[in-house]
Amino acid sequence: MLYRLPSVGQSDAVTVSAPVAVIGPPDPAAAFTAALDQAGLASIRYDEFPVDLSGYSAVIVVAGRYPEPERLDVAGLAEYVRAGGSAYVEFALDDTGFLPQGEIRTAHIERIFTTVALAGIEPLQILDEHSSQAQQVVVRGKAVELCSYGTVAGTHEAIFGPPDVTFPALLDIPVGDGRLLYATTALSHHVKGRYKPVRRWRRLLQVIVGQLTGVQLAEDIEVFTEPRVWVATGEPVKLVVRSSTKPVAELDLVETKPGRFESDLQYLDDGEHTFAVGDQHVTVAVGPRAERYRRMVDRAIAWYDRAGMFYDAPDGSKGVAEGLSNEIDAEGKLPFRPVPRGDCFTQTAHAFRMYADLADFPRGRTIADNLMRLVVEEEQLTDRNQLYGSFEPRGARTDLTGTNNLFADDNGWISLFALMSGHVESGLRGVEALIRTSSADLGLQVDPWRTPSTLLVKGWDELSRSPIEDGLDLTSHWQSSAQCAYLYAYGLTGDQGYLDIATRGLDHMAGQHPRARLETSRTCEAGRFLLPLVGAYHYTRKPQYLETMRSLAGYLKSRQGPDGGFAEWDGKCPPSNEAYGVDEAAIFAANGDPVTDQLYGTPFAAWALPLAYRITGEPVFEELAHGVLDYLSRIQIDDPDDEQLDGTWQRAFDFDSWEYFGSNADLGWGPYCVETGWSVAPSIIGAMLYLTGDNFFPPAPSSLSELPASIRAEFDAIAAGQPAPATFTRRDDGRVIRIQNGVQAVLGDLTAAGEPVWARNEPVGADEIYVRGTDGHLHHTYLDDRVGQGRWQQLGDLELADEPVVAFNPGANAIEVYVLGADGHIHHCSMIDVRGGHTPWEPVGTLHFTGSPAVLYDEELGSVRLVANDTAGQDRRTRKVNRWHLPWQDYSHWITA
């Protein structure tokens, strides 16, 4: 039933032509004045309440200090309403009890939904308000709850009905002879806050205006072209109108289904064309695909700079940020997500390397080189244990306690692009690390999360013999990137082992197709499965791979919308209201939601489909490639005033309401997030593959490289427990590097002032490393035979004047550390605990010296001996007995001419 306000008495001063008073600052007031204009109603805005409200047909009071509530003096307003007036107030406080009051809280997971039918909005329709501030009030008396807050699963509609726990969002409260509409949050904030879906929010404010004034609301007519925005030269377009009655238009319109009117197909010349329907206009551009795709790439490349994705180093030398988080703030901005992800680094690097060649853009190659250098030098794990060769996916490597899960999908992409960028040894180590954690039978990842503890406890051999559980053998989400890396390694080296492990896994997955584990959705799985199949077919021409690609193409075709995108289907969607917002999830709620995924689906389809056509020559792949790339070009955000988003894509796009919107159930990457990798880079890689005709995978190899055998030998030596002595040195930039079995690793971000020194701590199986930092203090780390490299730790506040010297003291099972302090004294500490337990600094006597001492362990005496020159030029010697140093002795008289 349609909810309508009953008629109420009006004062003699109020007439149908009386204006509406809008109280509040211009920006939030504009949301309501737009609704009033739409209804043909006059309004007057005030910063403060007028003294006399009796001359107004209604009063609207917007929140002027949101996200903080504003305390109002409502005495005059209360009198106006009780006398028969109608008023709307939002998110405010008063001391009289006229306005509902309640605890103010953030609606983190809850969203607003309609509880009754409103004009043009059905019950249970969702309005996403992005963690708004709200008052948790209680419905009292005869108040009617028009909209509620609650944890509801659904995209446009609360598909499981209202939740058990709700609180009001919009109330209709009888007061005396009048009515008060009260919103517990600032509904007027929907414009600045970018609330979605936009048309529904606009309609809600129009409904409020209609309820306040009794004005009949105009029908909400929608006019668009199909396809929208742009169409390729020589391809047709039609005009579409959604309306309950046939509209007046330039073109003849035919009702194709209730409420939908279409024109005949139009073939238009290149250029822009505008169609008018009543007082509404819609424009579509026509032009060549190559120009459109190139424009799309140019704008996406420019977005990286404009949005600050390279931090404060435009050459990429500090990396690239992950992107923008999902949680839109009160200013309508997305939080910057600075996480330095290796997969984002490498995908972005490849996109910029391709763009450097496409656009003669030398800076692109500089950015690519710097990003790949950071990944190879800073993120690859080189400690000689079961983590060897893997890449830390969330920034520079640190010690074992700080190492993240070595996710198989992230590591697959990083390894692939390391190979493509010319870092072949590093890439092959990444590939071998993935092979060692795969099933010996199927060649697929056993545990794609690859937690460090699992790898270290189980080891490579046990992992390879473990069963693959939970359908993880049938998910391209987790398996495809490693398969692509294997295939690329084969193309580079000719080593049959790489092709064999890739095809073993693909044979299994293709043989089970269309069965799949739906990590995100069936549509995303299809888009992700294509790329390794393309690579495998490229090298083998195996009919099974082509048939599987054709099947995937048929599925994608069945899910393709009129603008080219592939709708999400069969997803990991919350099965109840209670399950909403508690885990990673798809960005749609039910099959039929017109939503595409620009994080896990669309970009990967855009990447693979041009290659599928190039390698197979089958028209269906070209048609699908055109469709998905056309779609990406249409939905690319085009708003020059928005530096944060202009030129990029957000995760969820609703191609029916034509805006970025989707189910906001995903805890990590919701519908409004932006990723430099996974989304932007793969999208433009796909476009540039189309533009350049590049095959992506190398040609079939004609010779065999010896490098894979040497890489496997490194892993075999680690598995056998063979030792590999390490040396340490200072680079020109001050970073300390470790060289072990010819493999280099940068040790943290410490900048050293001198050369490192180290001693073997045999009882604990580690090397202890010390260096003077540019801060003048001594720093220590370790290389443990099992758990690997530690973090740098500063040893006290002592200021050094020279380099440290160290020696292992087997009599005490301790590392003895000596330095010359800035005070001229020699200072000592011992490392007596298993890990990091250094004693406090203590001076060795009271003499002053010119440099650090020479130190050795005297096996005959069982003590540590020290030799140093004091400031008088005398040769001084002492030794450490137990934990004490004997007095310095003068040995100068033993020196002869």
What does each of the following model-derived ranges do?
Residues 21-99:
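Helical hinge/lid and interdomain linker segments adjacent to catalytic or ligand-binding clefts
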Residues 66-137, 145:
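A glycine-rich, often tryptophan-bearing local segment used as a flexible ligand/cofactor-contacting loop or short
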Residues 337-357, 399-422, 471-491, 521-538, ...:
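Well-ordered alpha-helical segments within folded domains of soluble proteins
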Residues 218-220, 288-320, 417-420, 424-425, ...:
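Terminal, non-catalytic domain-edge segments
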Residues 717, 721-897:
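A structural motif
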Residues 31, 107-181, 188-193:
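Catalytic beta-strand/loop cores that center a nucleophilic Ser/Cys/Thr
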Residues 2-18, 153-242, 264, 270-272, ...:
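Extracellular ligand-binding/catalytic regions of CAZymes and related secreted enzymes
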Residues 285-344, 363-401, 429-464, 503, ...:
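Low-complexity, Ser/Thr/Pro/Gly-enriched N-terminal "stalk/linker" regions
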